[in-house]
Amino acid sequence: MNYAVLPPELNSLRMFTGAGSAPMLAAAVAWDGLAAELGSAASSFGSVTSDLASQAWQGPAAAAMAAAAAPYAGWLSAAAARAAGAAAQAKAVASAFEAARAATVHPLLVAANRNAFAQLVMSNWFGLNAPLIAAVEGAYEQMWAADVAAMVGYHSGASAAAEQLVPFQQALQQLPNLGIGNIGNANLGGGNTGDLNTGNGNIGNTNLGSGNRGDANLGSGNIGNSNVGGGNVGNGNFGSGNGRAGLPGSGNVGNGNLGNSNLGSGNTGNSNVGFGNTGNNNVGTGNAGSGNIGAGNTGSSNWGFGNNGIGNIGFGNTGNGNIGFGLTGNNQVGIGGLNSGSGNIGLFNSGTNNVGFFNSGNGNLGIGNSSDANVGIGNSGATVGPFVAGHNTGFGNSGSLNTGMGNAGGVNTGFGNGGAINLGFGNSGQLNAGSFNAGSINTGNFNSGQGNTGDFNAGVRNTGWSNSGLTNTGAFNAGSLNTGFGAVGTGSGPNSGFGNAGTNNSGFFNTGVGSSGFQNGGSNNSGLQNAVGTVIAAGFGNTGAQTVGIANSGVLNSGFFNSGVHNSGGFNSENQRSGFGN
């Protein structure tokens, strides 16, 4: 703020209104109290560890304990000093404010000057008041200068106090890690790369959880910042499986959403409230379009169920601006047929060849579906990558070829997946067999990395748990090509683990390239016994390419025992099917 150009009416008023210096003085008292408590804690902590190591507990272990405890006692002392410094600077700011207010012209004096000036101007007959007007204006200019000088002094004092403050983070960064295999400082856990993480296998800072890539996440397996939950890609999500690689989501509350600021699950788009909507600002379930309130609507700004068009109010209308039931056309009011589409069996369907209620898509079996060939309730179905739109089996899916509930991606088998070709729950990545994975080609849970077999891995091609490095077999490794626990360096390679014949493998008895897990014969696989020739698969006993699950022989499938192409679910031998036994 450039207070030099502000008149004394504003500068004086601002200095004499508000809370004054009382809050800053209260803050100084609080900082003084904190400094005293921290100082007492530092003294007690140091005394206890010293007495323990010199009396009741002696030997190398006691010496190691004392050495590990010393930095924490030092941090408590440093924090006490910083708190005392903050108290002193708060008092300095309060003093600067009081001095500035004492030097500031009182608002009543400024108002009196302006009132006198106005009176003299209004009564200035024949210029007789000119000398008095000049004197009053001169006094006003002096008030202006006095206020500006007071504000300059206040700004200088407050700035000097702020410059004296030392961030607490500097002291925290000097703390050692409590755990093994960490690269960084002040981590409470193992296998972290970064600072101030509480958990294992994180890449980033201040995460509370495991297997995160990013900062300040509360949960596990997230890629991004400030997420609460698991397996999210993006920032500030509350839930699991939101966003996906290349399409991060932010501010979602729920699971498996693709987009931003959705409240619910399985939505594709922004600011939807409900389940399985495709579009923006929808309230309800299975709507395809924007601004719809209800279920199974295709179009925009519809209120009701199963409408196909724009601005309809009611059930099963086809057209625009209709109010009623089963109407076909535009701007009609009343009741038409039970269905406004063709070849439908049921009530209030506006699509074609539907069986059920309130469907606005085509070939659906169920209630409130707005895309094609869905079986279930409230599916909207958007085209995801190479996969056809719709063809979901379940509830509240906005993606394509999903089997389950609340999936916004494609070819998922499970619940709340925002990614594609996953088997499990809350995955925002791709080709995962497990749950809450934000990475890709993982077999396990809460992995934000790629190609891991195990849990809580933020690294790549690890077999085990909580690894933030590359191609490790074991746990809590931040390095690469290590076999064991807590390693931060690089092993000899070309593999880690035991009995591997290929290169860049971790785990046991793999013969391919770039795999993790057990007895994989293909390349870039994770899991167990994926066959020779299988490429980019996750799970168990797969023989197909880019498949996820158990014993799939087809291509781009998720689930169990699928032999076709683009299938989710189980026991499917045809192509582009969701569900079971197709």
From Swiss-Prot:
The ranges of region (Disordered) come to 241-278
The answer to whether the entry has keyword Transcription is no
Task: Give the similarity note.
Answer: Belongs to the mycobacterial PPE family.
Keywords of this protein's UniProt record, alphabetized?
Answer: Signal
Q: What is the name listed in the Swiss-Prot or TrEMBL entry for this protein?
A: Uncharacterized PPE family protein PPE62
Question: What spans are recorded as compositionally biased (Low complexity)?
Answer: 258-278
Q: Which domain of life is it from?
A: Bacteria
The organism is Mycobacterium tuberculosis (strain CDC 1551 / Oshkosh)
Keyword Signal in record: yes
Q: Bias category Gly residues: which stretches? A: 241-257
Q: Which GO terms describe its biological process?
A: response to host immune response
Q: What span is annotated as the signal peptide, if there is one?
A: 1-27
